[in-house]
């Protein structure tokens, strides 16, 4: 039987983790292990897990090491042939794991990333059907905020996957692993899934949207402040481009997409200026 390692991150997640884990353990397909990586929660997250889910493999970090480092820790511990990264504020449909197993058994060898249909918690609107990259290097969640419809009912090739809920082939992760880990730990969080998807694509590893495996996402359970998110988005966007893209495309993107909006961003959030220094430091490294 195919064995899957489910890697879940928590950070002050007591309000969400029980619903998430309950949905995991109610799955009909049970050949999996659950690894929870806690990033220094100050609430009851850890005690709740220890009391109610003794079967969970629990990694306790003293501080918030970020999504990238946390996921990498879980992947390294996991023994599965496939790795399922799962945000703690997601609830799986009861047939989720069974559908994933069907897909794993049927996909071609070059498929290394499976994107479930991530719905918003209202079960009406789509949160993500994968990641799309535009000519000007804007990155979008496919279908974000759209009402679920027939166009999200068929498998389709996609550029990348949303790591809030993605199933990765272990061999694929080993193939793209760099000196900064599977997920690049310099990112902390945001855009790390775009970067990983892009590195995989450059090695000929493909991503597939799998609508029959559905889950439901609350969103932003970490309550990241908007200005922090804005800073990380700007910084990590360019980390991603500098690692993976051609210089001509980066220049086009900067002139026609980023430049017009930078003045507003810097005026509204002076902290974002720090992103410029970080980007130059990243390039030098």
Q: Residue locations for each model-derived region?
A:
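A conserved acidic beta->alpha catalytic loop
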Residues: 23, 38-47, 63
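Conserved donor NDP-sugar-binding/catalytic core segment of glycosyltransferases
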Residues: 94-128, 132-133
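Active-site-adjacent helix/loop segment of glycosyltransferases
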Residues: 207-285
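Short, flexible, basic/aromatic active-site loop/helix in glycosyltransferases
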Residues: 134-158
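Short aromatic/hydrophobic "clamp" motif used to bind/position activated sugar donors
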Residues: 83
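A short, conserved alpha-helix in the catalytic core of glycosyltransferases
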Residues: 159-177, 181-214
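N-proximal low-complexity "stem/linker" segments adjacent to membrane-targeting elements
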Residues: 1-26
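Glycine-rich, basic loop-to-helix element that forms the pyrophosphate-binding segment
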Residues: 61-78, 88
